[in-house]
Amino acid sequence: CVTGVQTCALPIYSDEWKAEATRRGLDCETSVPLIFDRLLAQENIRMFGETGVLNEVELHARAEVKWETYTKKVQIEARILGDLAMNHILPVASRYQSMLLDKVSKFMAIFPKEKARVLAEQDLELIEKIARHMTCIQTQVEAMVETRKVINKMGDIREKAIAYHDRIAPTFDEIRAHIDKLELIVDNEMWTLPKYRELLFLR
């Protein structure tokens, strides 16, 4: 869904730093499931074994628990985001859009056509913006749900965790970007969830 909305997802490390980290022998992996792979690196298996902390079987078990825990956390976040978007954000945005449409209709009924268009111009722009953001949110949430259904059928716990990281988690920022835009548009009295300023400064 392309609307020109900029998401806040930025690379944690720049390409320049990645090159410098490689030169220094530092790891700057940002994928959580892949970071857990380090538990199973031969040098770590040897170190844990020699110190009597964990044997190889225990390390594999611990890695599996970490992959499963990560997957469940992203699953929960995805379900909550979908619920908030579909059952809280979209209904409120739709009601505000209907209110604007009613206002425009009254302009059209009272004033001459050209004057009514001038008076309703800003409201019409808001109506279109709301429609675009609502469409993108609904499309992305539905796509996220279908993708989750496919991923949940995966048998390999590591591959499932990687799929949730690569295919589900990035959609959170995309959906949130459109919700943030609606938050700035919808009437404050109609918005049912706490806004950012309300989280920082209690009314």
Describe the predicted segments one by one.
Residues 1-8:
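Single conserved hydrophobic/aromatic residue that forms the stacking wall/gate
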Residues 13-203:
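Mature extracytoplasmic or organellar-lumen-exposed domains after removal of signal/transit peptides
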